[in-house]
Regions:
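Loop-rich catalytic cores of soluble enzymes, especially ATP-dependent carboxylate-amine ligases
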Residues: 125-126, 130-253
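Terminal catalytic/cofactor-binding subdomain
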Residues: 1-168, 174
Length: 253
């Protein structure tokens, strides 16, 4: 066994249990929009993050370069509410739960609280994969090194010659997504990877909601284009699904 494969197995397999307790993790991202069709007001969303700890009991986990809260944590559930890349995108990253219903109950409570607050100033969270007012917002990253680094990296697409990359390197500030994490066991982890690899395309079409008004792309899955034809897609391994199913552990590694 090569040294690199040995290290990969040590890093990723040793923590997988034979028969673990099964939990689910969920992350949901949404645009915050100005209901008047204008750009999202940055002061409105920053004020929201100062308000939420007072009413939800969350602690302030991270602040931006100017001291504004950008990530909030519930010490009990470990739920996190944060800005994702830009101040116009809010993310709910839920602590591990036994069922989706547990998460749904907390999510509905958070949403009701937030929508009520935003509604006072004609703003709201909407369920779109692309920010409806992407062309009106300034699409600048949160004033935090991680997000600034990401956006600067995406801008490098304009310096890469001989490639067919799109002209929206700021897309990281206006696309939204969702993630689900499932616990696996040593006996089934490879079967789970293969299964999700096979259903990914169908899932993408069934739940597509990222239609982009800036181009005639004729698709509701523009997020794929944004990722694949950007600096993320320069290396094919960073995008798409696995090219084939894996026969066994050795084949996988």
């Amino acid at each position: 066994m090569s040294r690199s494969i040995d290290l990969l197995k040590k890093r990723y397999l040793e923590n997988i249990k034979e028969n673990p307790d099964l939990f689910i993790g969920i992350e949901l991202e949404f645009p915050i929009v100005n209901l008047e069709g204008k750009a999202t007001d940055g002061e409105v969303v920053k004020d929201l993050f100062r308000y939420l700890p007072l009413v939800l009991g969350f602690t302030i986990e991270k602040v931006d370069d100017f001291g504004n809260p950008i990530q909030l944590l519930d010490p009990v559930s470990q739920d996190t509410i944060l800005f994702e890349v830009a101040y116009t995108t809010i993310e709910f990253a839920f602590g591990k739960a036994k069922s989706i219903q547990e998460v749904e109950e907390r999510f509905n409570f958070y949403m009701a609280t937030i929508q009520n607050k935003l509604g006072e100033v004609n703003h709201a969270i909407v369920g779109c994969g692309i920010h409806p007012n992407w062309d009106k917002n300034d699409n600048q990253p949160v004033a935090y090194a991680r997000y600034q680094m990401l956006m600067n990296y995406l801008k490098l697409s304009r310096t890469v010659l001989g490639t067919d990359l799109h002209d929206y390197p700021e897309y990281g500030a206006f696309i939204c997504g969702s993630q689900v994490q499932l616990d696996v066991s040593k006996p089934n982890y490879l079967r789970v990877i293969n299964a999700f690899n096979q259903i990914e395309a169908a899932k993408a079409f069934l739940f597509a909601n990222s239609e982009f008004s800036g181009e005639d792309w004729d698709t509701k899955i523009s997020r794929d284009i944004f990722w694949e034809e950007s600096m993320h897609g320069i290396y094919a391994e960073n995008v798409g699904v696995n090219a084939r199913l894996f026969k066994d552990e050795n084949d996988f590694f």
